[in-house]
Structures are given as structure tokens and as C-alpha cells.
Amino acid sequence: MLKKENFTEEHIRDLQSASHRDPLLLERSVYAFGLLEAITRVGMPFIFKGGTCLMLMLERPMRLSTDIDIIVAPGTDLNTFIEEAGKIFPFVSVEEQVRKGKNNIEKRHFKVVYESPVMERRIYILLDVLFEDAKYKRLIAKPIKNELILTDGEDLTVQIPSVESILGDKLTAFAPHTTGILLNSNKDMEIIKQLYDVMTLIEVAEDFTEVRE
């Protein structure tokens, strides 16, 4: 379990001193794992994916990420889970962010708000939820634990795709005429992040047959 000390300015400043990274980015990454643990504690069934997932998957993640991306089965009733997770320390409220969808893909987005010890104002972590039957070749259980967060007692675990499965997923970002990001769509930073993740995953992937599948 995550210790309450994670959510203090002292801990964030310690991380800043050790890594020379932006304190707000460090803070938001730590609080993202607080949100991940919160939705796990309330029993929400989900698969954890996306850039922040790599911070659990990789022994030494190469970049920080601050959003939580999950997949849930179609028809999952999220409201009670989200409401209860939003009450767990250090969070203070939840607000659904309504976006216009495309390609008939069912998604919901939530801003989960906390009091920032670094900025001394309210900031949110974004929870992106995709409703679909997961198509990953292989899933693994991973404890919520990495070099940024302090833990105590038994670690909660989450289901995540294998390195090879998430690499295959990330590669779809470069299929702009199907499931990926359209070129010249003012999303250069998103493409760069995906490319960086792909390069990192290629270095540790072992079974490229699984990537293709």
C-alpha cells in the first residue's frame, strides 16, 4: 500500500533533488499512482495500460507520465467505483470531462482532484476509461510499486499487458489511416511520446511474434 508520506511536499522535493526533474511533474506522477491504487481498492475491474503503465512495467522507466489509462468491459457501471475512489485520500473530488467521441469508440474521462502540496492549489489527475473487450495476447499481474513511491505492507496488484503486447498496442499510433494518430493533426507531442515509448519497449521485448499478434 502507498504510504501517506508520498503525498507531501517533502517527498516530492526529495524526488526532485535525486532526479533533477520538474517537481510538479513528479508530484502528478506520484498522485497518478495514488489514483491507480484508489480504483484498485474499490474493486473496479480493469486493465491498466498507457504511458504510466510503463512506469510499473519497466525496471527503469525513461519518462514520467501523469494520466491513468484503463480498459473496462463494455457495460461496466463505473459511477459507484469512481465516486468511491474519489473519496480516498489524497483526493477531494471527481468531475467527469465530457468529450466528443469519434469512430464510435466508447470512452469516459474523469478529472480526479487533489490539493497540490507543491503548487498550493487544486490540480487533477486525468482518468481515461476505454470500454472494450481487451485483445492483448498476454496479461500479467504487477504490484503498484516503483522508485517514485513509498510503500508499506502488502502491495496491491493490477493487470497490465506484457511488454510485447503493449508494444504492439503502441505501434498502432503509427497507423494514421486506421487506429492511429492522423499526421498533421497538431498532435506532434503525442506522436513523439508514443515513439519514445516504442523505442524503450523494443529494447526489452523478447518475443516479437507476440508483438505481431
Model-found features: residue ranges?
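N-terminal glycine-/serine-/threonine-rich phosphate-binding loop
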Residues: L2-E9, T40
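Metal-dependent nucleotidyltransferase catalytic core
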Residues: V72-N104
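Active-site nucleotide-donor binding segment shared across nucleotidyl transfer reactions
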Residues: L36-I68, V72-P74
